[in-house]
Amino acid sequence: MSEKIEGDGTDLTISANNLTIDAAADITLDADGADIKFADGGTDLLGFANSSSDVVIKPLVNAKDIIFHQYDGTSILEINDGAYAKFTAAAVAPEATLTDGATVSWNALTQQVAKVTLGGNRTLASASSGVTGEFISLLVIQDGTGSRTVTWNAAYEFASDTAPTLTTTANLGDLFVFRYNGSKWLEVGRNLALTLS
């Protein structure tokens, strides 16, 4: 196939076996029609669209998925046409260490899996930035002295409205799991007096 550039006064077509766009700085694709499409053999496959300044990425062939591969071709993430995401391996929220202090703050959006070592009797603030339906976990660890207590913010809801009594043994941990209902962090599980090493 020979290279050619064709224009009809409205549209421009560039044809070639291989086409390389090489810019010393940036490349900007600016589509006032709000859509940028990738096609294969004349069939649209993937689209990027502007929806009130939200970016929409979607396959343009019905009943097809968007699949992310790592370098060796292994599938890592599949955005399935059935409206779910499938991970080849676990999706992991790294454990965050909360800052110990008189009041312990916790961001549920960036610290979903958290731990704190108590250096005294503390108040646990309500986990901020919660999303309805979100699960979070907190490992509360006694320091080398032990017998530290926690006063829980009213946003944490426990069975029978009774807050738990922490383990008092030095260096042991208590693990709590909560689910957010839009206004309260509902406890869904706990394990007390855990040996951590």
Q: What does each of the following model-derived ranges do?
A:
Residues 1-24, 28-32, 36-41, 45-51, ...:
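Beta-strand-rich, repetitive solenoid scaffolds
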Residues 101, 169-173:
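Solvent-exposed, conformationally flexible loop/turn segments
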Residues 120:
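Conserved short histidine dyad/triad with adjacent acidic residue
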Residues 131-133:
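Extended extracellular/luminal ectodomain segments enriched in beta-structured repeat modules
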Residues 193-197:
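Short, intrinsically disordered N-terminal pre-domain segments
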